[in-house]
Amino acid sequence: MLTVISPAKSLDFESPAHTKRFSDPVFLSSSRELITELRKQSPAQISKLMKISPKLGELNAQRYKAWKPPFAPDNAKQALLAFRGDVYMGLDADTLTSRDLTFSQKHLRILSGLYGVLKPLDLIQPYRLEMGTRFRNKRGKDLYEFWGERLTTAVREELSGHRNKTLVNLASNEYFRSIDAASLGHRIVTPVFKDYSNGTYRILSFFAKRARGRMASHIIRERINKPEDLKRFDLDGYRSEEHTSELQSPDHLVC
């Protein structure tokens, strides 16, 4: 079983990593292609492209300019420990043990606009490039066309090495669009987190992001490798509501 999550815009490259272990991104040459194109953009163009402030446009122009492989612990950081934000607050990666990290390295992947697919301990350098950015490049009109079938193929190949070939989708819609579900060839389970608000259960973005991180953490810490075991998830007031059959399907787990 393999779980995918989204990255985060918030980054932490100041705090020291609590592990010395690291790995390398598999699509680094493709990342280099994107960086080459991004360096042609002025800070003002970056601000317009990403709909961010001039200050953030300048920051990211500097990041693209400074981006330089090969990566090492002195100029980069493990992806799972570098990303911050709601999902990662729920995941709480800084408290994962060495054995947890070993399990996550096989069972968790992070989808990324710049790096494609990341293992938790893959080294990255600071960047901002959301998957939904309409950045025209040599391969197409946006990042979905840039990555094409490559991310689907990578995930499919990862799953081929697992006994249980189920993909658990804890990523946002923006990022999971980079995976062609129809051609993946394996079962996909998508947990859905709902909160009671104004008389009904619905998805509240902030809480849903945090809950996706909590479930990813639960999968890692409990060594869950069968999708049916996800029904035991019971944290922060979320739990599988199997009795509400109208909300359930074999490929959706409503919490």
Describe the predicted segments one by one:
Residues 1-43, 245:
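Short, extreme N-terminal leader segments that mark the start of a protein/domain
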Residues 23-81, 153-157:
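A contiguous strand-loop segment
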Residues 53, 57-127:
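A glycine-rich, hydrophobic loop/mini-helix early in the fold
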Residues 119, 131-141, 150-153, 199, ...:
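Conserved nucleotide-cofactor-binding alpha/beta core module
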Residues 135-192:
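A contiguous pocket-lining binding segment that forms or flanks enzyme active sites
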